[in-house]
Regions:
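Short coil-to-beta transition motif at edge beta-strands of beta-rich domains
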Residues: 28-43
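Short polybasic amphipathic segments
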Residues: 18-24, 38, 60-63
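Short coil-to-beta-strand transition motifs
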Residues: 2-3, 42-52
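Short linear motifs in intrinsically disordered
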Residues: 25-32, 50-55
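Mixed-charge, Lys/Arg-rich low-complexity intrinsically disordered regions
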Residues: 3-30
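Short beta-rich binding modules
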Residues: 10, 39-44, 54-57
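Short, compact, well-ordered microdomains
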Residues: 47-82
Length: 82
């Protein structure tokens, strides 16, 4: 049986100060917590990159082992396991 994913974009949720998963402009996940895993689409390599959401006082929210942090997260194509 293949793994099922929900795919959408990252968006900042000002109600809880977290980045969440938007699908068709609706919150599928209203906010990720530190340590939650997801995949981010790398347009240059044309592949999914596994990562996790974290937060630091210096750079705010960021994706581990990527260059994405802070407002750079807005609009990224991501997927999460169902």
């Amino acid at each position: 049986m293949s793994t099922q994913y929900t795919t959408g974009i990252l968006g900042y949720n000002s109600h809880n100060d977290r980045y969440g998963l938007l699908v068709c402009d609706l919150w599928e996940i209203d906010g990720f917590h530190c340590g939650e895993t997801l995949d981010v689409w790398d347009y240059d390599k044309e592949q999914w990159i596994p990562t996790r959401m974290e937060m630091s006082w210096n750079k705010g929210w960021y994706l581990v082992d990527t260059n994405y942090c802070g407002s750079d997260l807005e609009g990224l194509r991501v997927r999460v396991r169902q």
